[in-house]
Amino acid sequence: MNNITNAQNPFYGQYHTPHETVPFDRIETEHYEPAILEGIRLQNAEIEAIIQNPEKADFTNTIEAFDESGELLDRVVAVFGNMLSAETNDDLQELAQKIMPLLSEHSNNITLNEKLFARVKEVYNQKEALQLTQEQKQLLENAYNSFVRHGANLEGEAREEYRRLTTELSKLTLTFSENNLKETNAYQMLLTKKESLAGLPEIIIEAAAETAKSEGKEGWAFTLHAPSYIPFMTYSDNRDLRQKLYMAYNTKCTHDNEFNNIDIVKKIANTRMKIAQLLGYKDYAEYTLKKRMAENSESVYKLLNQLLEAYAPTAQQEYKEIQELAREEQGDDFVVMPWDWSYYSNKLKDKKFNINEEMLRPYFELEQVKKGVFGLAEKLYGITFRKNTEIPVYHKEVEAFEVFDKDGKFLAVLYTDFHPRPGKRAGAWMTSYKDQWIDKKTGENSRPHVSVVMNFTKPTENKPALLTFNEVETFLHEFGHSLHGMFANSTYRSLSGTNVYWDFVELPSQIMENFAIEKDFLNTFARHYQTGEVLPDELIRRLVDASNFNIAYACLRQISFGLLDMAWYTRNTPFEGDVKAYEQEAWKDAQILPVVQEACMSTQFSHIFAGGYAAGYYSYKWAEVLDADAFSLFKQKGIFNQEVADSFRNNILSKGGTEHPMILYKRFRGQEPSIDALLIRNGIKK
C-alpha cells in the first residue's frame, strides 16, 4: 500500500491549488485505490482512538470526533464518485466494481462497531443534561439514528445478514447504472436520406451530421441523449422514425444482452425490502420515510392522490385536444401514441400560442444564459462570480469560478459542465467536491466546492450553444441546488448545505425555476445571438401564456413515477413477477396515453434504483408544493426583493440540515405550506 507521504499520489497532503481545489490535472486512475485504502485505514485509526479514549464519552470526544473522522476518505470518494458520473471510462468502472463493495464493508464496520455505538449511545442517553446548542443536538440525534438505522442494534446472524445485503446492494446499484450508460451510448439511429429529416430544425440536423462525422460515418446520427432524442421526438415529421427512436429509448436495458436490468430491478427492490425488514420496518418505504418531511407512506399517497384528483380532468382534456388536432391531419381513426405526443403537443402549442422552443432558442445562447443566471444570484444575494483558469478541471469543457459574497469575502468554488459526452451519464445534477464546515481548532470557515453538471445542446461548427427554454429551466434548477451548497454556514460537515431531508432538498432548486418566465429576469440576458435584439415582449407574453400548456399531463407523468416508486418500495414480500406488467399496474391510474406493452421505465429508472430517490420520487411534487408557496412571497413583495431573498438565504439556504425543515420553512414563510399556491400557479384552481 502507498504510504500517506508518497509524493506520487496527489490525494495525499495538501493540493497546493487555488482554494485547495481538486488537482484533476495530476490525478490518474491508479491513484484512487491506494488513497481510498489509506483513507479507510486512517478513519479506522481515528475510530479506534475514540473507542480507546479513557475519558467518559462526551459530545466532544465522541460525537464531534466521529463527525470529523474520515477526511481523506471523503475527499477521495467525492472525486471518484463524481468522475464515475461525469467523466467515466472502462478502467474507472472496473475499479468501481472493486471499490464500492469495499466502501460498503467499511461503512458497515463503522455502524456495526459495538464499542463505538456504546459510546454514542452513552452520550445520547444523557442528551437532556448536556446543554447542547441546536446544531449539536441535531448532530447527536443524526449520529445516534444513523447507527440504529444501519444495523447497530442487530446481533449475531442478523448483523452478518445486514452486512451481506448492503454489500450486495452496492454492487447491484452500480451495475444498474453502468448498464444504463452503456445501453444509452450503444444506440445510434443513422439516417442517410435527406427526406428522413423532414420537420427537424437546422441546428438539430447540424448536430446529427457532426455526431455521424465524428465517428467517420456519412449521414445524420441521432442518439438517446436528451439534446438529440427530445428534438427528434418533437419535430420529426416521420412517424415511423419517431416510433423507432421512442422504442429504442423506452426499452433500454430490457434486451437480451449483457445490459439487461430486469433481474437487477427485482434484486434491488427485494434486497432493500430485506434490509428494511431486518431493521424492524414493514417495508423499505417505511424505513426511508422515517427521515423525511412526509414521515410515512400514507402522507405520500395522500399527496399523490390529491394531485391526481386535481389534475386528471384537465389532463384528459389536454389529451382530447391533441387527439383532435392529430385527427384533423391524419383522419378520424388516428390514435395519438406516446411517440406522437411531443410532436402534436408542439404543433398545438404553436397553433394556440404561436410559440415553440425553436423560436426562443436563438435568444438563449449559453454564455448569455450563464450571465443571466449568475446575474440573478447577484441581484438576489449580492454574490459575484469570477472565472479562474488556474483552478484545475477534469475536462476541457469544464469551467471553474470563484464565488465572492457581497462583502467581497471568498464564498465558494463553482464548476460548470454543460454538454453531453460518452463518459457522462444522462440528466442534470449538482454535486459537491468539498462540503462547508467550521474548523474547531482555528475557527476558520472552510468553504465549499460544488459543481453543476448538465447535458445541454452542444455548439456546432456554425452556431454557438443555443439552449431550449427547458434547458434554461434546468440550468436554474441545478444552480438553485448549488446556491444551497455555496451558502452553507454550519459548524459540522454532515449538517451543511444540501445535507437535508430528501423531500426538502428540491425546494432551493425548484424555486429558481419560477424566474424562467419572469419578464424582469429574462430582460437581463435574453438577446438574439446574431442581432443582439432583446427577447421581444410579445414572445415573453406568449411564453407566459403557454407556461401551463399540458401542465396537467406533465403532473400526471410525475405522479405516475411517484406511484411506480412507491409500488416497488411498499412491498413486504419478495417480487418474482413480470416487471413490465407490475409497472403498468402500479401507475395505471395516472396514465393518459395508450400503453406500449414493450416499454419499460423501471429498467432505466436510475433515480430510484441507483440514485437517492428510492421511496423518494414523490419529493419532486412535495417540493413543488413548497416552492409554489414560497415563491408566492417573492411575487407578493417583488421578485428581486432583498428582504425576502435575505430571509430565504438566512432561514433556508445557509441552514442546511441544522434544524427540522418544517421549522426552517415556517420561519421563512410565516406559515405551513399550502397546496393551493401550486394549483393556482398551474391554473387548476382559480
Regions found by a protein language model. Give the residues of each.
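Short pre-active-site segment immediately N-terminal to the catalytic Zn-binding motif
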Residues: 457-476
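Active-site-proximal, well-structured secondary-structure segments within enzyme catalytic domains
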Residues: 135, 139, 168-171, 178, ...
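N-terminal helix-rich structural modules
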Residues: 3-201, 206, 221, 634
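C-terminal, non-catalytic "cap/extension" segments appended to globular domains
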Residues: 4-31, 38, 219-221, 368, ...
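Short, hydrophobic/aliphatic alpha-helical segments
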Residues: 261-273, 449-452, 490, 655-657
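Short His/Asp/Glu-rich catalytic/ion-coordination signatures at enzyme active sites or charged loops
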Residues: 16-31, 80-99, 122-164, 223-263, ...
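Intrinsically disordered or highly flexible coil/loop and linker segments, enriched in small
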Residues: 41, 45, 49-56, 72-89, ...
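Short, hydrophobic/amphipathic alpha-helical patches that form generic packing surfaces
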Residues: 72-82, 141, 145, 247, ...
